[in-house]
Each structure stands twice: as C-alpha cells, then as structure tokens.
C-alpha cells in the first residue's frame, strides 16, 4: 500500500499550493479565501522513484461555527489515516493561537507518527530570521519552504520519504474497484449517502449548499467487490458559479464523471428534477458512462401505494428518450435502498463492460431484419451484411453495410431498441457505427 502523507494547518497557510507543488499539477482548489479546502482531498504522487498518496486536509481553526467544528473533526479523522503529517504554518502571517493549539494537538495525539514542521512562504532572508521564532511550537527542526516558487520543497520531500518504511514489493496492484461518481446539485444528500454506506462520518455533512467543494475518494468492500466512491461538489448552474471556488468545484465534478464507470445522479425528492439535473445526466451520457438516478430523502415525502409510480412517470417524461436509465427511491437518513443502489450500480457497470459474441449478434441481426426491413433512401436500399461488437470501454456495435449514408435515424433507433430488448444494457448508453470500406459514421 502506498504511504499516505497529510498536509495540515490553519486556513490560508498555503496547504493547497504546496499540495499542487508536490504533485506538479493543479489538483486541489487554490484561492486566497480562508478555508477553501474544506474537506480532505487525496491524490497520488511520485518523488525520486518513490510513490505515495498526498492528502490536503481542511483548514484547522478555532471558530465556534458549526462548519468550523465539522472541519476540525474531519481534520483529526484524516490525520488518523496518515503515515506522515506535514504541519504547515505561514511565515508572513506569523505564529498564531491556532498554530500553537494545533502543535499541541499533534504532539499529544499523533506523536507515534512521523511529524514534519513546515514554515511556508519563506521568500526572503528577513522572513528566514523571523521564522526562527516558530520553535515556540515545540518543533525544533523547521523546514523553511516556499510553495509558491518551490524553494526548500525538494529537501522536505527527500526527508519525508526517507523516513517512511519501504512498501513490500508486489503490494501495489491494478485497481479492480468499480468506480462510482456521486453527483448532483448542492445539498441533495450526496455526502450523507456516502457516509451511510461507509458507516462513518467521513465527509462534512451540512445543510449549507456546496459544503463538499472537492471530489473525495472513499473505498468500500461489499460481497467481495470493492467500490471507489467519488463524492463531488454539487454542480450549480454556471450563472450561480463564482469566479473562484465554485468554478473550480464544478470542473472537479465534471472530471469526476470522466473518471467513473457509473455516475450516480442524486435528486432531492422534495425538489424534483430540474434542468441542471438533466444537464448532469446528459453530461454522463455524452461521456458514455453508466447512469443510475437516485431520488433521495424519500422518507420526507407523504405517499400512498402509487406515489413512487406517479413520481417515476414524471421523471420519465422529463428525461425523454433516456428510458434505459434506472430510477431508485432512497433515503440516506433511514438507509432505505442504499445497498440496493450499490448492487444496481454494480450491475450497470457489468452491463457496460459485457461482450456479446459475433455469432450471437448476427443471429440477432438476421431475426431483426426479418421483422423490419430498412426503408429505401433516394431509391437505394440499405443492405447490412453482418455486425460485431467493437472494442471499447462501453458497448459499441459495428454494422457493415453497402453505404452508411443510407442509414435513417428511425431505423437506427429501432436497432438500438431491439439490442436493448435482446441484451441487458440497463443504465448504459450504447453506440451504433455503420461501416463501409473502413469509414465510420458514429451516432
């Protein structure tokens, strides 16, 4: 298993900038607003041939508001998972009460871990002199760095990774987990859903829209199958996204969909489906991901024996031609249908990766063409010789014909519907490609 390094410190000391410097990419959200990294964010890195995971925690502070207390709890929870802890302070801002308090917590509760004291933003000789006073924290060997220009970071990484024990050979294997992205508008219950599955308050849960700003990965094992759950910031309409934090969070959610096999799109039962929900669903469909629609907070709805039927009918009308997307009614609060949702997502993942033999497909084609013959176009008749499944991450079927330009949209839709009737592609977009002389016409 790759060692986990955690960055911790009060808000705005430069943890996310250092995170990005170490990974050499813009991964964590960076903004001068204190507390931008509210929850933990983990990414993989490599230095001098050594692989590791780096975790950017929420900023530590002693404010009394509900969200700050939740951030503190999450920070301590995150540190318990780490192999090494990098305690970050700010040379320009000077030592604060929060710095001293956090130093005491680290020395008292995490003395069994590798602790590294980092003074960031040391970008002049004068700041080096002033930073000497930081030994008041009790850490006598500070590392003076500048995450902004990179000075001192290499020496820090050398020492941090040198102090870690060597990972046993062959322990790092290919990821066989099913990748699920939990996406939706803010405050529909995505983090509550993940926490209920994990059985732990692993993500900050608050009724403040947009509490989970970054995409966060968690792993879950069920019935000998591992799942990677990617909990994301809620996707807002672009007009509601501020130039800084919300913009980057929305991009992160879109990237989470690109990483997943199945997008679990969550709705609020009381709010119903909106244009932004349809946009999220279509975003996943366009990227050829599996899709599962969850209606959360179902426990809050007054209902009779036909409520769910009527509700689903309204959803189907709004979704139009996405009849293959399954709908489940769940409650993260009461845990209604949570594991059924997970099992359904697994089945969708399997549907997405299934392969149908060429012999089966051509038998299917023969039977289908016997039912309905393609209409002529400009006096010419479409003739399909055979079909096969093409190699792809999602189901793609190639139809070899005399002229792809003769294929009409209604016949294409007919073939797709027949394929769905014959094989289980629930929750999965499928592509039909009509081929002639190595030229491809895609749907």
From Swiss-Prot:
Matches recorded under CDD domains: EngA1, EngA2
UniProt cross-references to InterPro entries, sorted A to Z: AAA+_ATPase, G_ENGA, GTP-bd, GTPase_Der, KH_dom-like, KH_dom-like_a/b, P-loop_NTPase, Small_GTP-bd
Keyword Repeat included in the entry's annotation: yes
Residues the entry annotates as binding GTP 1: 9-16, 56-60, 120-123
Repeat found in the keyword field: yes
One Gene Ontology MF term: ATP hydrolysis activity
Domain EngA-type G: start-end pairs: 3-168, 178-353
SUPFAM superfamilies per the UniProt record, alphabetical: P-loop containing nucleoside triphosphate hydrolases
Binding site for GTP 2: 184-191, 231-235, 296-299
UniProt-listed GO biological process terms: ribosome biogenesis
Domain of life: Bacteria
Domain (KH-like): residue spans on this chain: 354-438
Keywords: GTP-binding, Nucleotide-binding, Repeat, Ribosome biogenesis
Function, as annotated: GTPase that plays an essential role in the late steps of ribosome biogenesis.
Subunit structure: Associates with the 50S ribosomal subunit.
Family classification: Belongs to the TRAFAC class TrmE-Era-EngA-EngB-Septin-like GTPase superfamily. EngA (Der) GTPase family.
The protein, known as: GTPase Der
Taxonomic lineage from the root: Bacteria, Pseudomonadati, Chlorobiota, Chlorobiia, Chlorobiales
């Amino acid at each position: 298993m790759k060692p986990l390094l955690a960055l911790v410190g009060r808000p705005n000391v430069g943890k996310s900038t250092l995170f990005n410097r170490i990974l050499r990419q813009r991964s964590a959200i960076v903004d001068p607003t204190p507390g931008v990294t509210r929850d933990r964010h983990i990414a993989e890195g490599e230095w001098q041939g050594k692989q590791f995971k780096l975790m950017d925690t929420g900023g530590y502070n002693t404010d009394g508001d509900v969200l700050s207390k939740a951030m503190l709890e999450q920070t301590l929870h995150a540190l318990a998972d780490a192999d090494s802890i990098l305690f970050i302070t700010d040379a320009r801002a000077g030592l604060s009460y929060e710095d001293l308090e956090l130093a005491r917590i680290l020395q008292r509760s995490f003395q069994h871990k590798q602790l590294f004291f980092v003074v960031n933003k040391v970008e002049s000789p004068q700041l080096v002199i002033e930073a000497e006073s930081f030994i008041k924290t009790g850490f006598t060997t500070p590392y003076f760095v500048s995450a902004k220009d990179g000075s001192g970071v290499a020496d820090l990484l050398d020492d941090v990774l040198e102090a870690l024990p060597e990972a046993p050979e062959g322990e790092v294997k290919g990821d066989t987990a099913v990748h699920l992205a939990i996406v939706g508008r803010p405050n529909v219950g995505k983090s509550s859903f993940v926490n209920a599955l994990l059985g732990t308050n692993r993500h900050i849960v608050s009724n403040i829209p947009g509490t989970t700003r970054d995409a966060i990965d968690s792993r879950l094992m069920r019935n000998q199958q591992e799942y990677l759950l990617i909990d994301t910031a809620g996707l807002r309409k672009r007009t509601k996204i501020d130039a800084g934090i919300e913009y980057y969070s929305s991009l992160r959610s879109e990237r989470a969909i690109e990483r997943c096999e199945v997008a679990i799109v969550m709705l609020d039962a009381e709010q119903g489906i909106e244009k932004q929900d349809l946009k999220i669903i279509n975003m996943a469909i366009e990227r050829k991901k599996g899709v599962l629609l969850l209606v959360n907070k179902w426990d809050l709805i007054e209902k009779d024996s036909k409520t769910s039927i009527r509700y689903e009918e309204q959803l189907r009308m709004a979704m139009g031609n996405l009849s293959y997307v399954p709908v489940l009614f769940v409650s993260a609060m009461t845990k209604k249908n949570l594991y059924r949702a997970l099992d359904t997502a697994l089945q969708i993942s399997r549907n997405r990766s299934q392969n149908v033999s060429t012999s089966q497909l051509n038998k299917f084609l023969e039977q289908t063409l016997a039912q309905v013959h393609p209409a002529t176009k400009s006096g010419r008749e479409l003739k399909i010789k055979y079909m096969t499944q093409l190699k792809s991450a999602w189901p793609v079927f190639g139809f070899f014909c005399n002229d792809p330009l003769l294929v009409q949209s209604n016949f294409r839709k007919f073939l797709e519907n027949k394929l769905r009737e014959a094989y289980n592609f629930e929750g999965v977009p499928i592509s039909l490609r009509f081929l002639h002389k190595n030229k491809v016409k895609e749907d």
